[in-house]
Amino acid sequence: MANLKILSFGAGAISTYIGGSLALAGEQLVFMARPGVADDLRQHGMKLDLTLDKRRDAKQISVLNPASFVAAPSLEEALRYGPFDVALFALKSYDTASALEEMKPFTEKLPPILCLSNGVDNEPAIANLLGADKVIPATVTSAIGRRGAGDIVLERLRGIGIATTHPLSGQLLAAVNSAFLNAQGFPNAAAMKWSKMLTNLIANPTSAILDMT
């Protein structure tokens, strides 16, 4: 199976964990990030502390040197490295509207988007701009800590859910699992997303009260 060419919207904790893991597995990654973050990634690369995941047999922090991926400060520049097979979208929900605004001039160049953001409103918003055939619902239940730009730590390994309703779903599941991301397919995308949101509604206040992560 040919390697995927993947565009990542942002380089936050989830994007770095998933995109970085895919890059470690040999996929081609282009991270679109704010100019300051993109510059940092270009200079220092990425550091992924994945030692918690015993399947990886990683005794030390995994390092991605700057030559092993691309960091671009704008969507226009990132798209010059296309065409892409899929895009990762793991932004905070309050950043979705501005991200969609930036996408508007480039809708014809954008690939299907694997939407990993929390909540249930992001997929409909993306579909409204790009079409339902360009959206693949997904969830992340692993806990990731961010130490700095391109520097993350896997704090708790659970996995990733990917809706199996898209033609790319099977290939994505295979690629994600080859990257040790512990993916599972779900035929009911709405149930998958709502389950994650309800879990967050219960878990987040409890963790705050108990001072747990």
Question: What is the meaning of each model-derived region?
Answer:
Residues 82, 118-202:
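Rossmann-fold dinucleotide-binding core
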Residues 1-58:
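NAD(P)+-binding Rossmann beta1-loop-alpha1 motif at the extreme N-terminus of oxidoreductases
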Residues 4-5, 85, 158:
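Nucleotide donor/acceptor-binding cores
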Residues 59-151:
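Rossmann-like NAD(P)(H) cofactor-binding subdomain of soluble oxidoreductases
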Residues 46-71, 200:
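N-terminal glycine-rich dinucleotide-binding loop that anchors FAD/FMN and/or NAD(P) in oxidoreductases
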Residues 107, 150-160, 207-213:
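Helix-loop-beta segment of a Rossmann-like dinucleotide-binding subdomain
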Residues 6, 28-30, 113, 135, ...:
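Hydrophobic anchor at the start of a short beta-strand
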